[in-house]
Swiss-Prot record:
Pfam families: Dala_Dala_lig_C, Dala_Dala_lig_N. It comes from Buchnera aphidicola subsp. Schizaphis graminum (strain Sg). One of its GO terms (cellular component) is cytosol. ATP binds at residues 134-189. GO terms for biological process: cell wall organization; peptidoglycan biosynthetic process; regulation of cell shape. The active site is at E15, S150, S281. The lineage of its organism: Bacteria, Pseudomonadati, Pseudomonadota, Gammaproteobacteria, Enterobacterales. It comes from the Bacteria. The gene is ddl. This is D-alanine--D-alanine ligase. Mg(2+) 1 binds at D257, E270. Cell wall formation. It is found in: Cytoplasm. It catalyses: 2 D-alanine + ATP = D-alanyl-D-alanine + ADP + phosphate + H(+). Residues 101-303 form the ATP-grasp domain. Keywords: ATP-binding, Cell shape, Cell wall biogenesis/degradation, Cytoplasm, Ligase, Magnesium, Manganese, Metal-binding, Nucleotide-binding, Peptidoglycan synthesis.
Length: 306
């Protein structure tokens, strides 16, 4: 008898739409491969009923809060249902950008200087206090939600007059935010499949950075794979990514973003433990560059689930 697989998608996070696209692409792939798979929107389905409904395994296609933060992983472990991707602790830390950076920094991996602000303490911060901190970083800065993905709620701020609106925007998506030094450089993303680091992809966008529009809307964004890095530099980047990935105890499939500055140094940006699987997604592109089709990729991820 075939195993009954729940493709968990949708949810309540700000990345719901992308999750649905990813989830249905995964579902169709599993069906093509002959699996007994079903789409389960965690916003509407009582997740504690998965076992009673006969599901044997879960393929997590949820993005952001409720999917990448360890909560769904905890429920699945309680239900004793195997699932794809990283475990509870790795997921929780990885979605927390600030704590991820603290860990990477402790390993002497380059991360950009930042300021961490919590919504519950915002009344303690005066405008002059925040501005004084930012002036140490120097403008421009990037203001981003601490616990959100897909570049949602992120703005680049070049002038003090734009600070308050940008901070409030970021707080709409997370109770904690990061104000980070903006670094102009060449962006790369590196995918990991099980313990294998896939070829880096160079990202060229006409926008100031690789934002939501660049990822999901703009057709002008270019993805270069092979990346154009020389062998030594590419191996350096892959090694940095491998260390960063393993430090968090991640498993399965993921992606880490980095930027190369004008002094030829790589800086880590952030990690994605449940990367998108849409037609514009980068993990399938990296896999394809070494001969792994989309359906083969989905099967490989399924086979290394917990």
């Amino acid at each position: 008898m075939k195993k009954k697989i729940a493709v968990l998608l949708g949810g309540n996070s700000s990345e719901r739409k992308i999750s649905i696209k990813s989830g249905y692409a995964i579902l169709q792939s599993l069906l093509r491969s002959g699996f007994n798979a079903y789409a389960i929107d965690t916003r509407d389905f009582p997740i504690m009923q998965l076992k009673k409904q006969g599901f044997d395994s879960a393929y997590i296609a949820l993005h952001g809060t409720g999917g990448e933060d360890g909560s769904i992983q905890g429920i699945l472990e309680y239900l004793n249902i195997p699932y794809t991707g990283s475990g509870i602790m790795s997921s929780a830390i990885s979605l927390d950008k600030w704590r991820t950076k603290l860990l990477w920094k402790s390993l002497s991996l380059r991360v950009l200087p930042d300021i961490y602000l919590q919504k519950k303490d915002i009344s303690k911060y005066t405008y002059s206090y925040i501005l004084k901190k930012i002036l140490k970083l120097k403008f421009p800065v990037v203001i981003k939600p601490n616990n959100a993905g897909s570049s949602i709620g992120i703005t680049i701020v070049n002038h003090p007059d734009l600070l308050i609106d940008s901070i409030n925007l970021a707080f709409n998506y997370s109770n904690n935010i990061i104000i980070e030094k903006f670094l102009k450089g060449t962006e790369y993303t590196v995918s990991i499949l099980n313990k294998k680091v896939l070829p880096p992809i160079k990202i060229i966008t006409k926008n100031n950075f690789y934002d939501y529009s660049s990822k999901y809307i703009e057709s002008s964004t270019e993805y270069i794979c092979p990346s154009g890095l020389n062998y030594q530099k590419e191996e350096e980047l892959k090694k940095i990514v491998e260390i960063a990935w393993n430090s968090l105890g991640c498993k399965g499939c993921g992606r880490i973003d980095a930027i190369l500055d004008n002094k030829d140094k790589f800086w880590l940006l952030e990690i994605n433990t449940i990367p998108g699987m849409t037609h514009r997604s980068l993990v399938p592109m990296a896999a394809k560059s070494i001969g792994i089709s989309f359906d083969e990729l989905i099967l490989k991820i399924l086979k290394i689930n917990k």
